[in-house]
Amino acid sequence: KRLYAELREGDIIADLAAHEQHWPLIVAADVLCYFGALGDLLARVHQRLEPGGWFVFSVEKILPDHDGVVPGNGNWALQRQGRYVHAEHYVYDAVCTAGFRVLRIDRPVVRQEAGADVPGLLLVAERIRHDG
């Protein structure tokens, strides 16, 4: 269908570090759920975006258990299905710390699992700070 101008497969952090190209847009749908801490990935994405470039990505949202306890460290947790969930405050803070401005946050259902909705976050962030 020719949906992609370019599709890269491999370790995303290593791939971003190995290339010097800059892009106006990077999209990572259903990718960040395979990372706990997001700082290193966000820093590499920031380096590869043009000033004013956008990073659009989704994460699965962390939810308290039936006793109201947030799993993991309160910022992110590894679930038994092998994907990470993230707290909204953590994602927002990590994005801003990496030099982005959050333009939009939506809270969609990102998948169905075992017949249940999996809540998520969909963010649009703009690169605002220069590296260095």
Name each region found by the language model:
Residues 2-14:
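Conserved SAM-binding strand-loop segment of SAM-dependent methyltransferases
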